[in-house]
């Protein structure tokens, strides 16, 4: 879909390629030590407690290395499609968006489409690298995620780990009834005037307009009633 490029992360893809090479080289030497810049982990589905233990162990190792060497580290997670229990995915996503690993950048690598609860883990990463023919979303697999679980996921997103992912995008992935629009917003005045592109619901756009904000262009990304899955 032409209006969903906000999910694609060119920098993340480059980082993933670099880290995969370094990890392959290190695996022949010492599989128990992090690479020079980070670690690449391939997760299996369903995601469970073993995955939590694996990811958290590596993330904390990398955080220790980042503090010792006074530089950021990267943890790349290859996330599969599949059916995982909500609490298992949420627990890991909660750790990744928490305060224990401030110097570790989490990158989600999606070589294939990821739907269902596994998509929540990708959304908790700071960067998302997605293959050109893959999609991310449809968290409820055609149905709305229950309201209490939607709010839990949105609380994770609001921690601001990924500045390109906002409530409206995630809500569209969790609730087929939600719509998503690509809106051009005019901010500032006179010489300070500029245009920003934001992804918002039609309700949010109307509120901006009611508040006097100029919205000269709106393009529909997902209509209400459609599944929210983006490339």
Task: Please give the residue ranges for each predicted region.
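Soluble extramembrane regions of membrane proteins in the secretory/endomembrane system
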Residues: 27-231
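Bacterial N-terminal signal peptides
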Residues: 10-22
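Bacterial N-terminal signal peptides that target proteins for export
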Residues: 1-13
